[in-house]
């Protein structure tokens, strides 16, 4: 089935998604951005030198700077940062086709409310089906055509399968899921754990500590996902374990690099420059976990370090002297 797909958000990830879907050749694809000058340059040069230097975009990819460009799309992907998605829904919502499916591609939690992004989008766009795309995929890898697999989840499995068919290509494979909660929380929480792994690397705390953080962090993710109504199996899949391993070990990860800077004692503002989603998610997740009586000591420690309530030595001391328990 051929689809008309619009990708809203002309940053690295949105551009990479639009490019790989266009290359699959099954759907008409338009990349929609809010910067007319950038869109004009992309049309002329087929190159996004700021976000994806040296990677040329396919000739079949269309570009637009007007919100009404999404009007004919059957699938609309929101590829801007998590905290910008509510504003995007309000801006683009009036132009959505009646039966358009909206897919959030951000990995975060709404900071003001603690809501999942699908919940927020359903609040803003109550007449539309909302899905989520998440998993281990860096924009540059996707745009270069390197093999990448991610998850796409909708409450209706038939919609998830339709989206997986429409978006997948030779180098980009999506697995369908009906667990929107698990897929979203995996994407949000792994960013927090990647910061923790960066702190370990930057502080020279050792590879053994990193391995412990990944394993125990996965346990935290699983407890939280189940408490929120998601499935533990999802945490062990692409959007949980897969994304955690990638983000906690690759220096392409903004969250890992932010953690490394913290571990070195550098003063870094996570809201300056490229947004560090995990820094925003840490305090929200810590607060929500407390309300659910879910133990998340690593997430709590990362939140406290970012907020300046604990230094790294104190955080390690607290983690290592917790009461002995079973795994």
Swiss-Prot record:
It holds the Pfam family NAD_Gly3P_dh_C. The active site is at residue 190. NADPH binds at residues 13, 34, 107, 139, 254, 276-277. The keyword Oxidoreductase applies. Pathway: Membrane lipid metabolism; glycerophospholipid metabolism. Its main location: cytoplasm. One of its GO terms (molecular function) is NAD binding. Keywords: Cytoplasm, Lipid biosynthesis, Lipid metabolism, NAD, NADP, Nucleotide-binding, Oxidoreductase, Phospholipid biosynthesis, Phospholipid metabolism. GO terms for cellular component: cytosol. Its EC number is 1.1.1.94. Sn-glycerol 3-phosphate binds at residues 107, 135, 190, 243, 253-255. It catalyses: sn-glycerol 3-phosphate + NAD(+) = dihydroxyacetone phosphate + NADH + H(+); sn-glycerol 3-phosphate + NADP(+) = dihydroxyacetone phosphate + NADPH + H(+). It is found in: Cytoplasm. The keyword Disulfide bond does not apply. Catalyzes the reduction of the glycolytic intermediate dihydroxyacetone phosphate (DHAP) to sn-glycerol 3-phosphate (G3P), the key precursor for phospholipid synthesis. NCBIfam families: PRK00094.1-2, PRK00094.1-4. Belongs to the NAD-dependent glycerol-3-phosphate dehydrogenase family. This is Glycerol-3-phosphate dehydrogenase [NAD(P)+]. It comes from Rhizobium leguminosarum bv. trifolii (strain WSM2304).
